């Protein structure tokens, strides 16, 4: 048993005790700033340092001037001595051992970066600028270039930044603790492009697994998982016109057609490796431009350790994944997209986080970012941890991340994942597995406040940026303003549309008359939210099959069904979203392990489908009636709603001052002639799109390009040819 130090054994070496030396050597000292920095005595300045492995140490100014030799006071690397300085300033140590020599800029000779005002803003929950106010960023301090590291770990006994620059030795860069906020900080020179993590001694003295930086702007390529020091972006942005356009318009009245992309499997290089951001810029952006999409939405491109998670289990919310290059590359991609008028959206995951040991879970030895009680802090569906939205530091971390992507990378919006799981305390839980809110209800009030604040700040500080909720329940006012009691999202995914329409089109046509309501019911709520119609990645994975595989009938009918479905969707009120590969009817289910089946485009039916999607986009964008009232009931009117027997649907899309567009769907393989549709406007109507056209792989049936609407007994209509399993669109010529 180690006996206590007596007064003789407690004697000081200079003004440092043996106990303090041993505490630093063993990694147990929590504040070396008290004893290691330069200190002033009546005789002048003295220096003290701990450099393991050194046998000799001399002291230099940052200009390289020699100011003194230090004496070894402990064989494990402690040195101390008088130096010739007239004022306090940062110094550099030159260490020697045998024939080796190396330099160490003393991190303890710098003052703090954060001050009382920073502490105040952190405590009161300031949002704007929080991430750049104390995140690890490059800066110049006291004339020296370096990085400011800071991390929130209020329950840690000792926190160090470790990395390539100090041989991952947690005794070398022990951070300064700011007790009012729980933040630890240190300024470290000579750490450019270095891998690093935080070494944390927990509240009970236990050494925790090394933690990646929650605010890191760059990470290592998996399977490595350290953070990497990164400079500020130097991108020269050329997207002012694009951003000004979206800031000035009502997004609800603009054409929005989103191409959903998994960056790692859209295309691969010949050797099977990922495309870089520059390669994606050169290939994906021109493809989307040609296809007529207005936006690219990426599945999460934030850093994540596990490819099959598709990015939805992220450990680095501030870092674009290293799979496709550095953050500058992603900035170039966004700039390139904006230059040709294409917006970039990011799937964003504030609902939960993975339990990888280098991540946020049990960050400082306590449940810091998550709830301690698994009834609140563990997600049974995904085996992940749930953020504690009631902690102001957690809320600030997430909200600043949303602002960060808009500010630093000029993103056009965030599609917020798994919103339903955030809103309900009993989501995927049985009785007894959840804790009611303060009023005894199942609503997660802390999450509601978080979402409202996030949306208010995004829209308030970045006009033109949109937020989209993936929300699958009937929670009211998801896309209504916060001041009207809503959650404040700009748009919401219409999961009901997706479910009902896929169910309908998978049925054999002979049975469809019994399920007519699957295509009409959605109009009862189509304008209660600002909807996006999503045919997303979720519908083509986990054994669900691709969209073409879901369609009923033989191969010809499958293609005809999918073409008519796309026509139905592009004519239906709501913004559009289509997952990659479905535009050319890929047969196989999507997998993140390889590229899409681009070879299918050599076959006419697949290439015809692609041409149809392109023409649908171009028609949707060029015809205001198809988009300007996507979210308002006065832009839609049924023409034929109850023809169950023939499975025919027709409606009129309108916009003020614009020509109306009639959408007619014949969803059986029966070719119909002289089918009457009440169009409401007399004169010639032009057929502007026909999904049965031969160029799309159809039979070529149609109306010869035009029909004549006449007044017959007070009702204006036309006798139409309805191609089999097809959607046509008509527009009056005058």
Swiss-Prot record:
<dbReference type="InterPro" id="IPR006407">
    <property type="entry name" value="GlgB"/>
</dbReference>
<dbReference type="InterPro" id="IPR013783">
    <property type="entry name" value="Ig-like_fold"/>
</dbReference>
<keyword id="KW-0320">Glycogen biosynthesis</keyword>
<feature type="active site" description="Nucleophile">
    <location>
        <position position="417"/>
    </location>
</feature>
<dbReference type="GO" id="GO:0005829">
    <property type="term" value="C:cytosol"/>
</dbReference>
<dbReference type="InterPro" id="IPR014756">
    <property type="entry name" value="Ig_E-set"/>
</dbReference>
<dbReference type="GO" id="GO:0043169">
    <property type="term" value="F:cation binding"/>
</dbReference>
<keyword id="KW-0119">Carbohydrate metabolism</keyword>
<keyword id="KW-0808">Transferase</keyword>
<dbReference type="Pfam" id="PF22019">
    <property type="entry name" value="GlgB_N"/>
</dbReference>
<comment type="function">
    <text>Catalyzes the formation of the alpha-1,6-glucosidic linkages in glycogen by scission of a 1,4-alpha-linked oligosaccharide from growing alpha-1,4-glucan chains and the subsequent attachment of the oligosaccharide to the alpha-1,6 position.</text>
</comment>
<dbReference type="InterPro" id="IPR017853">
    <property type="entry name" value="Glycoside_hydrolase_SF"/>
</dbReference>
<comment type="subunit">
    <text>Monomer.</text>
</comment>
<dbReference type="InterPro" id="IPR006047">
    <property type="entry name" value="Glyco_hydro_13_cat_dom"/>
</dbReference>
<keyword id="KW-0328">Glycosyltransferase</keyword>
<dbReference type="GO" id="GO:0003844">
    <property type="term" value="F:1,4-alpha-glucan branching enzyme activity"/>
</dbReference>
<feature type="active site" description="Proton donor">
    <location>
        <position position="470"/>
    </location>
</feature>
<dbReference type="InterPro" id="IPR006048">
    <property type="entry name" value="A-amylase/branching_C"/>
</dbReference>
<protein>
    <recommendedName>
        <fullName>1,4-alpha-glucan branching enzyme GlgB</fullName>
        <ecNumber>2.4.1.18</ecNumber>
    </recommendedName>
</protein>
<dbReference type="GO" id="GO:0005978">
    <property type="term" value="P:glycogen biosynthetic process"/>
</dbReference>
<comment type="similarity">
    <text>Belongs to the glycosyl hydrolase 13 family. GlgB subfamily.</text>
</comment>
<comment type="pathway">
    <text>Glycan biosynthesis; glycogen biosynthesis.</text>
</comment>
<dbReference type="InterPro" id="IPR044143">
    <property type="entry name" value="GlgB_N_E_set_prok"/>
</dbReference>
<dbReference type="Pfam" id="PF02806">
    <property type="entry name" value="Alpha-amylase_C"/>
</dbReference>
<dbReference type="Pfam" id="PF02922">
    <property type="entry name" value="CBM_48"/>
</dbReference>
<dbReference type="InterPro" id="IPR004193">
    <property type="entry name" value="Glyco_hydro_13_N"/>
</dbReference>
<keyword id="KW-0321">Glycogen metabolism</keyword>
<dbReference type="Pfam" id="PF00128">
    <property type="entry name" value="Alpha-amylase"/>
</dbReference>
<dbReference type="InterPro" id="IPR013780">
    <property type="entry name" value="Glyco_hydro_b"/>
</dbReference>
<dbReference type="InterPro" id="IPR037439">
    <property type="entry name" value="Branching_enzy"/>
</dbReference>
<dbReference type="InterPro" id="IPR054169">
    <property type="entry name" value="GlgB_N"/>
</dbReference>
<dbReference type="GO" id="GO:0004553">
    <property type="term" value="F:hydrolase activity, hydrolyzing O-glycosyl compounds"/>
</dbReference>
